[in-house]
């Protein structure tokens, strides 16, 4: 199989122990769990005389491990509810899941008052506190609901962890790296909703991108709240096709993390359970199912109607679920994590997920085994063996010669013959091409003339459609939006996280000032950052806060000015403009070498009939090298 898996089970003693503790529960499968959540804010495990451990063999606190619940006051941690669930799981011998670390909702209110740097420190402190309190965690929802549009406050977390970056999801990768550093043996999950309907493709793109970039993600979590049709009258029509698509695209372990069917109609709920639970449970890449509540009236859905016990009576779906879990198909269903634990941590990390044709791409395989020993790793690119790696660090190089998508596969072989697989990938692009030539600095950068290349290579847009009113300016710009503005062409319909890169040639090193010609009709204003790329890292030059230029109109352009906080070096380099706050139209940015007033650089093209002067007011000819004054403006003639 093309997924992370092990061909051998845990020791008989561990497996037997799990079976013995699960005898009273609905599932007796030793390799995948059927779990549930704590009920209500009081974290009840047993409700109305019904005992949690009689039904379920995994627990997720509904709220007790969310940041806002734990650290309402900075530096003061309330672990009471989390401890109750953790100790209950430990007492009964089943799994406890930590939910969740990075989420654009239910974080402490005091986080809003911090700078991005201070927010980052707060996140580090939060994760360190969790590590100190729970030194060992078996399974974690690391990042929750980060698909674009799912949580309005996601940018608060995103900005603190480094933003979109080169992959579009650098901040998520950072969160997973932080979790893996603290809990290397934990199963690390990305969790989101609307994965079976409405946002399947967006979910796949996010998970696949961070996987390909080498994030230590072990599984994807489908919340599974979207199990009925939009009108709530039928079972979700795209459930099976979406589940198949996610597996085919990702080839990773999957969890159903928050399954519920919210309806008062017993027959509709039963129908959904019958169609959906076996399809997930019997998939050998599905590692477990967690139901999101079980007592009617005590779940998050309308009137708590997803509950399975109503008026102290089991609803038909629960009666059926009990019967199904006793079938051979349910008992013997395979899992990507035998024994419900992670044996292998294998993550393939190419130096970049986008590379120019003909350039060397370093590839690293970060691999470790919990109880076994690695013998060797076979590394493939598009099914071609490029190396057999026997010693850590496990590194190789590959030079692509053609454009397109490339698949990477690492097969880790242990000394006992057990094998584990991990996929990754990268794209090969044509060489970066400065559009309308390199931008000489001091000088003007027209926003629409960003470098040619490809999406996530020389630019990034949140969709693949040009929604502007200029359709024919460029054909190599993906979904970047070109609009009429300020008498010419501008970039419009900007969204947070989008970016554009420009190749510049700096003629004079030093601190530069900027004059950005922009428009913004939003009363909240907008913002963007300018960074220079050094050794594949972004070095911030400035953040431009854009005030409203006209009320709900984007036709009025004004100049926002300021100064870079670090100097530019002389020579060729790449700068990036990143949208930090949406709804700004970008026309152009003029860069001047501070302290000189130089507004542009001229290499040739000066004519004899142009009056030219040096800084002392003396007339010079076109052959003079240095700072000249032409038409009242300073230029550097080289």
Question: How does the language model describe each region?
Answer:
Residues 25-58, 62:
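Boundary/entry segment of secreted carbohydrate-active catalytic domains
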Residues 36-47, 67-80, 107, 147-151, ...:
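Acidic-and-aromatic substrate-binding clefts and catalytic sites of carbohydrate-active enzymes
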Residues 40-53, 121-130, 199-210, 272-277:
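Short, acidic/polar
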Residues 54-72, 80-195, 263-265:
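Substrate-binding cleft and catalytic face of glycoside hydrolase catalytic domains
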Residues 71, 129, 141, 145-165, ...:
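Aromatic-rich peripheral "rim/lid" segments of glycoside hydrolase catalytic domains that contact
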Residues 80, 85-90, 95, 165-188, ...:
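Glycoside hydrolase catalytic-domain groove-lining segments
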Residues 339-390, 397, 401-594:
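Extracytoplasmic
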Residues 375-382, 595-638:
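C-terminal outer-membrane/trafficking sorting elements
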């Amino acid at each position: 199989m093309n997924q992370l898996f092990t061909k051998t089970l845990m020791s008989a003693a561990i497996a037997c122990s799990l079976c013995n503790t699960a005898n009273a529960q609905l599932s007796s499968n030793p390799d995948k769990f059927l779990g549930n959540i704590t009920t209500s804010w009081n974290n009840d495990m047993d409700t109305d005389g019904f005992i949690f451990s009689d039904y379920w063999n995994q627990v997720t606190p509904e709220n007790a491990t969310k940041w806002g619940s734990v650290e309402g006051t900075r530096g003061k941690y309330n672990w009471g509810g989390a401890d109750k669930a953790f100790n209950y799981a430990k007492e009964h011998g089943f799994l406890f899941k930590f939910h969740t670390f990075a989420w654009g909702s239910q974080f402490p209110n005091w986080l809003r008052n911090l700078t991005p740097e201070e927010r980052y420190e707060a996140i580090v402190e939060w994760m360190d506190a969790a590590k100190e309190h729970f030194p060992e965690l078996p399974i974690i929802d690391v990042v929750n609901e980060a698909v674009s549009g799912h949580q309005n406050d996601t940018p608060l977390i995103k900005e603190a962890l480094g933003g979109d970056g080169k992959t579009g999801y650098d901040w998520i990768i950072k969160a997973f790296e932080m979790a893996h550093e603290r809990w290397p043996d934990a199963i690390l999950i990305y969790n989101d909703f609307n994965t079976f309907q409405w946002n399947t493709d967006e979910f796949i793109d996010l998970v696949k991108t961070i996987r390909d970039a080498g994030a230590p993600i072990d599984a994807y979590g489908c919340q599974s709240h979207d199990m009925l049709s939009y009108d709530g009258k039928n079972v979700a029509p795209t459930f099976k096709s979406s589940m198949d698509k996610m597996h085919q695209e990702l080839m990773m372990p999957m969890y159903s993390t928050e399954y519920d069917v919210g309806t008062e109609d017993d027959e509709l709920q039963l129908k959904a359970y019958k169609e959906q639970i076996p399809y997930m449970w019997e998939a050998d890449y599905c590692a477990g199912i967690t139901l999101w509540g079980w007592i009617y009236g005590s779940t998050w859905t309308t009137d708590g109607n997803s509950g399975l016990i109503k008026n102290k009576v089991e609803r038909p779906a629960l009666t059926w679920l009990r019967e199904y879990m006793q079938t051979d198909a349910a008992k013997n269903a395979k899992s990507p994590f035998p024994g419900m634990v992670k044996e292998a941590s294998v993550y393939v990390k190419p130096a970049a997920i986008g590379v120019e044709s003909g350039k060397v791409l370093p590839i690293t395989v970060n691999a470790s085994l919990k109880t076994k020993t690695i013998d060797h790793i076979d590394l493939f690119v598009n099914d071609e063996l490029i190396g057999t790696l026997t010693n850590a660090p496990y590194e190789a190089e590959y030079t692509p010669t053609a454009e397109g998508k490339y698949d990477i596969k690492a097969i880790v072989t242990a000394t006992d013959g057990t094998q584990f697989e991990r996929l990754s990938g990268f794209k090969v692009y044509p060489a970066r091409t400065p559009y309308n030539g390199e931008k000489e600095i001091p000088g003007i950068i027209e926003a629409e003339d960003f470098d040619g290349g490809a999406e996530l290579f020389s630019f990034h847009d949140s969709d693949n459609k040009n929604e502007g009113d200029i359709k024919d300016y460029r054909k190599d710009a993906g979904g970047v939006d070109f609009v009429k503005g300020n008498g010419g062409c501008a970039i419009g319909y900007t969204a947070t996280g989008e970016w554009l890169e420009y190749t510049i040639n700096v003629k004079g090193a030093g601190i530069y000032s900027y004059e950005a010609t922009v428009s913004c009709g939003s009363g909240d204003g907008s913002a963007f950052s300018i960074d220079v790329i050094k050794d594949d890292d972004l070095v911030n030059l400035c953040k431009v806060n854009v005030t409203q230029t006209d009320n709900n109109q984007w036709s009025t352009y004004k100049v926002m000015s300021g100064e870079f906080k670090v100097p530019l070096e002389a020579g060729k380099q790449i700068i990036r403009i990143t949208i930090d706050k949406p709804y700004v139209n970008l026309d152009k940015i003029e860069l001047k070498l501070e302290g000189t007033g130089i507004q542009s650089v001229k290499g040739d093209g000066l004519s004899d009939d142009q009056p030219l002067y040096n800084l002392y007011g003396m007339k010079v000819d076109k052959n003079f090298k240095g700072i000249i004054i032409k038409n009242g403006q300073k230029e550097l003639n080289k």
